[in-house]
Amino acid sequence: MIQSESRLKVADNSGAREILTIKVLGGSGRKFANIGDVIVASVKQATPGGAVKKGDVVKAVIVRTKSGARRADGSYIKFDENAAVIIRDDKTPRGTRIFGPVARELREGNFMKIVSLAPEVL
């Protein structure tokens, strides 16, 4: 579960390396975000010459969490790190590549472009 002030790795080539969660979108007073949820975040580390710079406020969708997610069949999926992909307002990724596996729950959130770019969907 991701909450305010959580730091996440960025799993795309938008230029950001690490982001800090500012707010979880989707309802007033919402505290936690899971896989497939959209957050507002600030870029804390960035690579030179990238599309986003340090200090930029961006929207991102969570693609991997350490706490994991429960599936409808009763199984759980967990990852080794917390990671997100920076997106535009129309739910398309800012970068052109996705690094690492993403969870199948992104299909339900209509993030089909991220799912198609990902090397592996678990």
UniProtKB/Swiss-Prot annotation:
A GO cellular component annotated for this chain's UniProt record is: cytosolic large ribosomal subunit
The alphabetized list of GO BP terms reads: translation
Check the record and name the SMART domains matching this protein.
Ribosomal_L14
Plastid as a keyword of this entry, yes or no, is no
Q: List GO molecular-function terms, semicolon-separated.
A: large ribosomal subunit rRNA binding; structural constituent of ribosome
- Alphabetized InterPro entries for the sequence: Ribosomal_uL14, Ribosomal_uL14_bac-type, Ribosomal_uL14_CS, Ribosomal_uL14_sf
Q: Which SUPFAM superfamilies match?
A: Ribosomal protein L14 (SSF50193)
Q: Which domain of life is it from?
A: Bacteria
**UniProt-listed Pfam families:** Ribosomal_L14
Sorted keywords for this record are: Ribonucleoprotein, Ribosomal protein, RNA-binding, rRNA-binding
According to its UniProt entry, what is the function of this protein? Binds to 23S rRNA. Forms part of two intersubunit bridges in the 70S ribosome.
Q: How does it assemble?
A: Part of the 50S ribosomal subunit. Forms a cluster with proteins L3 and L19. In the 70S ribosome, L14 and L19 interact and together make contacts with the 16S rRNA in bridges B5 and B8.
Entry-linked PANTHER family: 50S/60S RIBOSOMAL PROTEIN L14/L23, LARGE RIBOSOMAL SUBUNIT PROTEIN UL14M
Q: Which family does it belong to?
A: Belongs to the universal ribosomal protein uL14 family.
| Identification of the protein by name | Large ribosomal subunit protein uL14
